[in-house]
């Protein structure tokens, strides 16, 4: 099979993996090395780093052949699809060739399970070792560790990659047993623990020894599928909170299930991917990470799923109207962060700006506040927004109208690397 044919198959097979960001790790020029993690050039797969930069990665599988038969996966053993596999050298040469042509600045590498997890990981390590040691590639690499592989292989992979991730796949043990019986929760969580400990140890050693080996400097992430099982948003959010706390994950990625295979245990093929639900989970994830919320505050047994009509912070605020309106001139930073339309940056700007004088609603807009949302929950020097009229009965409809204006119209689709452009 020609190399271009392999690339077409294996890049298309990788499109369902959502955990693809560079995380903002900054490793600049090194003498004798090729590439860096900070440039921004056009390329194969656009992703965004933690500081908002658009970066480009070659996003491929080492192989889409797999000994597992996960019912939701397009690459499962029983699915009749074209199979391909790169050799470690082919993958390394392809990556360095794309980099030298200015197509990419890094690599995102995952794989189906060939023969066994250990065998697959050995091939991935060999490919990355050729890149790092033979071609002196210094660019960004995000590698997916294979659950069930020997921990020593995970350690070796972490010494070659900037970020590691282990996909948790499904939110519950029951879902995993039903749809992916070849996988186990223990096999997924064990390498997560090793990566957590490895990154902590690496940081401690680097503080003492400047040239100590660096282990996964950008940390670890994971991905879970939303909509393949009947797990509630509440269950997913509590799982996310636990993963952040126990394993110090940098990111949890949510992937709306795209029906690609027919199975009685899965949604039918004509079911649309729950993209808006995925979006709400990402918004709630940010509330956990940057706004001081806890999962138990956002959802409870009476309301186990998000109202997709409103963003999670608006939903929380409407359920706690007794805490509003908030006085801009007196509220502390933590209180401001709970106001819809106010983010971490704008909240800090408010705290700083109000020292210089009284703030008005027109000032809030200049500070980055989304006044269309925030005006229902704020007072400026004891006054509501000019001309604002609403009641608890109508505020939901007014916020829904704001939300409809912020969401993209039409159906969103995954783009292929080989789609025609023009």
Where are these regions (language model features)?
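Residue-level signature of tetratricopeptide-repeat
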Residues: 353-354
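Short, flexible active-site-proximal loops enriched in glycine and acidic residues
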Residues: 67-69, 85, 98-108
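Canonical Radical SAM [4Fe-4S] cluster-binding loop centered on the CxxxCxxC motif
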Residues: 60-89
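Flexible, acidic/Gly-rich N-terminal and inter-domain linker regions that tether
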Residues: 1-65, 370, 378, 386-409, ...
């Amino acid at each position: 099979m020609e190399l271009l044919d392999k690339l077409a198959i294996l890049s298309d097979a990788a499109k369902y993996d959502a955990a693809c960001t560079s995380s903002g790790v900054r490793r600049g020029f090194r003498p004798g090395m090729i590439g860096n993690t900070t440039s921004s050039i056009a390329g194969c797969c656009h992703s965004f780093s933690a500081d908002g930069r658009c970066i480009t990665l070659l996003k491929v599988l080492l192989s889409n052949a797999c000994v597992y038969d996960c019912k939701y996966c397009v690459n499962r053993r029983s699915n009749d699809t074209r199979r391909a596999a790169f050799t470690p050298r082919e993958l390394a040469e392809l990556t360095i060739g794309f980099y030298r042509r200015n197509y990419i600045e890094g690599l995102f590498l995952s794989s189906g399970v060939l023969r066994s997890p250990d065998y697959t990981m050995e091939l991935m390590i060999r490919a990355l070792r050729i890149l790092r040691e033979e071609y002196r590639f210094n660019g960004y690499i995000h590698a997916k560790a294979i659950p069930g592989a020997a921990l020593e292989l995970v350690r070796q992979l972490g010494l070659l990659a900037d970020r590691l991730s282990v996909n948790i796949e499904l939110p519950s043990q029951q879902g995993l047993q039903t749809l992916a019986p070849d996988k186990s929760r223990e096999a997924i969580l064990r390498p997560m623990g090793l990566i957590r400990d490895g990154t902590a140890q690496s940081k401690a050693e680097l503080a003492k020894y400047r040239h100590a080996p660096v282990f996964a400097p950008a940390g670890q992430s994971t991905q879970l599928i939303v909509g393949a099982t009947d797990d509630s948003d509440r269950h997913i959010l509590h799982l996310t909170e636990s993963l952040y706390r126990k394993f110090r994950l940098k990111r949890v990625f949510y992937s709306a299930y795209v029906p690609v295979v027919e199975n009685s245990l899965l949604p039918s093929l004509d079911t649309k991917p729950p993209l808006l639900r995925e979006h709400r989970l990402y918004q709630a994830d940010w509330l956990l990470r940057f706004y001081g919320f806890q999962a138990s505050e956002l959802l409870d047994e009476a309301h186990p799923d998000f109202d997709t009509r409103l963003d999670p912070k608006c939903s929380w605020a409407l359920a706690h109207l007794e805490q509003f309106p908030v006085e801009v001139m007196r509220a502390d930073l933590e209180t401001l962060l709970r106001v819809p339309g106010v983010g971490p940056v704008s909240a800090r700007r408010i705290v700083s700006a109000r020292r210089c004088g009284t703030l008005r609603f027109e000032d809030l807009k200049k500070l980055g506040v989304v006044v269309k949302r925030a005006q229902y929950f704020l007072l400026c020097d004891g006054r509501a927004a000019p001309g604002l009229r609403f009641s608890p009965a109508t505020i939901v409809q007014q916020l829904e109208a704001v939300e409809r204006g912020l969401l993209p119209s039409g159906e969103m689709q995954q783009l292929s690397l080989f789609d025609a452009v023009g």
